[in-house]
Amino acid sequence: PTTSSISEWSSSSYGIDPEAHRRFWQLMNDVIAAAFACDTCRVVSMRVTDIFSGFEGDWHQEVAHEAHFPEGGKQAIIAAAHQRFFRDVFLDLVAKLDAIDETEGTVLDHALVQWTQESGAVTHDPIELPIVTAGSAAGHFATGRYVDYRNLNSVGHTPNETNAVATNTGLIYNQWLGMVLRSMGLSPSDYESGAYGGYGIVQLATEGWYAGYQKYGPSVLSAMGQDLP
């Protein structure tokens, strides 16, 4: 790299400049690719708070909290931002990892890259949480697939005057995370907590406005320690 991420981040217009966001995170991708190639690091977690948009208002309250509203304008804004991130950051990292040759493939072939959101279709709610992956973790995962784990007979949300989204519950995110950890050589005893499998705490009693894991039946909860079908 010939530029500095600090120079990008310190610009007064950085917060609403998606091109600056792209340049900043592509520099981070350079660091990640170099670290993986040198085997100085094997796990990276990218918590991206940049909005990848020129929206000048309160992104949290005026976009993220209103993306499921019937008028649809905020959904278009957040969808465009996600598309920019996918194109400019996720695919950039994947390409850089795939360009580094290793024995029997590339760094990407031996890695798993995951991109997801903190919310599903409705803000603060993990139902219908989309996940995009690249790499097979050295053959542990089949690639080139689209998999839908929703149960279309199990309703998560129904549309109303303040919500345009109809959702369905399905298998639980914790189950996927446990499968990822096992693909990296961990055993369930390394990460499981409580009576259920998968990675992460299961809290059956939650706030009144969100029923949490109560939206899932016992057959789904009991399968959390298994590989996804």
PLM region descriptions:
Residues 1-229:
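Ligand-binding pockets and gating/stacking loops
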